[in-house]
């Protein structure tokens, strides 16, 4: 992904995570339970575009936060 897109996607994930009442620790734990090898620190880096998102992580984040891909990739 392009850096500008990663910034927007990261902000969207943070906003959606906070809207669902979930902390970075909680999201990381749910991702880990779903088989994703990720830490709270990695979530923090994703939210500020310091780490790339992998397709399997995007799919799981979408499912855990119960949002659509459009909400995650909403670039306006």
Model-identified regions with their sequence ranges:
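DNA major-groove recognition helix of helix-turn-helix/homeodomain DNA-binding modules
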Residues: 50-71
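Short basic helix-loop element that most often maps to the first helix and adjoining turn
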Residues: 11-32
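Helix-turn-helix DNA-binding elements, focusing on the entry/boundary residues of the two helices
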Residues: 13, 24, 40, 55-58
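Conserved hydrophobic/aromatic packing and binding residues within compact polymer-binding modules
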Residues: 13, 27-28, 43-46, 72
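Recognition helix of helix-turn-helix/homeodomain-like DNA-binding domains
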Residues: 32-52
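A detector for short, charged/polar N-terminal pre-domain segments
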Residues: 1-8, 74-75
């Amino acid at each position: 992904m392009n850096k500008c897109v990663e910034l927007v996607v990261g902000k969207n994930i943070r906003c959606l995570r906070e809207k669902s009442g979930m902390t970075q620790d909680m999201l990381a734990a749910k991702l880990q339970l779903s088989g994703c090898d990720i830490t709270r620190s990695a979530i923090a880096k994703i939210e500020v575009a310091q780490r790339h998102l992998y397709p399997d992580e995007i799919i799981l984040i979408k499912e855990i936060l119960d949002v659509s891909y459009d909400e995650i990739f909403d670039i306006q």
